[in-house]
Structure formats: structure tokens, C-alpha cells
Swiss-Prot record:
<keyword id="KW-0862">Zinc</keyword>
<comment type="function">
    <text>Negatively regulates transcription of bacterial ribonucleotide reductase nrd genes and operons by binding to NrdR-boxes.</text>
</comment>
<keyword id="KW-0678">Repressor</keyword>
<dbReference type="InterPro" id="IPR005144">
    <property type="entry name" value="ATP-cone_dom"/>
</dbReference>
<dbReference type="InterPro" id="IPR055173">
    <property type="entry name" value="NrdR-like_N"/>
</dbReference>
<keyword id="KW-0805">Transcription regulation</keyword>
<dbReference type="GO" id="GO:0003677">
    <property type="term" value="F:DNA binding"/>
</dbReference>
<keyword id="KW-0067">ATP-binding</keyword>
<feature type="zinc finger region">
    <location>
        <begin position="3"/>
        <end position="34"/>
    </location>
</feature>
<keyword id="KW-0863">Zinc-finger</keyword>
<dbReference type="GO" id="GO:0008270">
    <property type="term" value="F:zinc ion binding"/>
</dbReference>
<keyword id="KW-0547">Nucleotide-binding</keyword>
<protein>
    <recommendedName>
        <fullName>Transcriptional repressor NrdR</fullName>
    </recommendedName>
</protein>
<dbReference type="Pfam" id="PF03477">
    <property type="entry name" value="ATP-cone"/>
</dbReference>
<dbReference type="InterPro" id="IPR003796">
    <property type="entry name" value="RNR_NrdR-like"/>
</dbReference>
<keyword id="KW-0479">Metal-binding</keyword>
<keyword id="KW-0804">Transcription</keyword>
Length: 149
């Protein structure tokens, strides 16, 4: 790694420690030319698969879109933001675990419904009604009946 002070190429690692619950590494380095010390942080770059929409358009995975959809369903519901973030992280890790470069948007929708069902049944029904395009009250009733099973 280049020294940020003198831009020399030769630096050595003096100390390494895990930080952030083991998700990153903090390294103390020293330049072998100017002897200045500096800290670097190393994290794994986790690449999310691309999303294939129902009309075959491909787009990058958008975490904000996922979050806003879930928050819209959870609006005015008693679910903490920590639980929402854990659900989002669970969905992201499931998508990465597929090992695929592309995933259908339908898969993401199903994963969202799975998480919402665990978090809040009302939010699940709200999301499912839009996602599955419920046409009438009968479809709501059928979905609610499935929840009660």
C-alpha cells in the first residue's frame, strides 16, 4: 500500500485487529521510507447479483428500493428499524448465497414477503396485496386464511 504522506510504495503492517464483529480488519502500517504511521481498514467487497425484472430488463440491485418497499408496508406498524435492517441483511445474504450473477425480481419479492410474514402479519398482507395484485376483498380473505393456518 502506498504511504499517504510520502507516496512511497514500501509500507509494512505493524498490527492487525478484527473490528466490527469480525466484518473488517483494522491495520496499523508504517512507511519504510518516511517512518510515518497510518491506519487502514479492510472490508470484503460483496457483490450483489443483478435483478432481472419481469419485462427482462436488467438493473443493479438497489438496497434503497428494497428498504423503501418494506418500510411502506410497515408504515405505522410497531416494528423497530433494527428488525427491518436485520431482515434486509438476511435478504441480501440469501441473494448472495444463490451464487448467481442475476436473480429474478420475483425471487426478491418472495424473500421480502417471507421476512414481512415473520415481522408483522399486517405489513405482509399490505405488501402481498400490491405484489400479487389482489383484485378484490376475496383475495385478501384467502391470504389472511392462509396466514391463520
Amino acid at each position: 500500500m502506498h504511504c499517504p504522506f510520502c507516496f512511497a510504495v514500501d509500507t509494512k503492517v505493524i498490527d492487525s485487529r478484527l473490528v466490527g464483529e469480525g466484518s473488517s480488519v483494522r491495520r496499523r502500517r508504517q512507511c519504510l521510507v518516511c517512518n510515518e504511521r497510518f491506519t487502514t481498514f479492510e472490508v470484503a467487497e460483496l457483490v450483489m447479483p443483478r435483478v432481472v425484472k419481469s419485462n427482462d430488463v436488467r438493473e443493479p440491485f438497489n438496497e434503497e428500493k428494497l428498504r423503501s418497499g418494506m418500510l411502506r408496508a410497515l408504515e405505522k406498524r410497531p416494528v423497530s428499524s433494527d428488525y427491518v435492517e436485520m431482515a434486509i441483511n438476511h435478504i441480501k445474504s440469501q441473494l448472495r448465497a444463490t451464487g448467481e450473477r442475476e436473480v429474478p425480481s420475483k425471487m426478491i419479492g418472495n424473500l421480502v414477503m417471507e421476512q414481512l410474514k415473520k415481522l408483522d402479519k399486517v405489513a405482509y398482507i399490505r405488501f402481498a396485496s400490491v405484489y400479487r395484485s389482489f383484485e378484490d376483498i376475496k383475495e385478501f380473505g384467502e391470504e389472511i386464511a392462509r396466514l391463520e393456518d
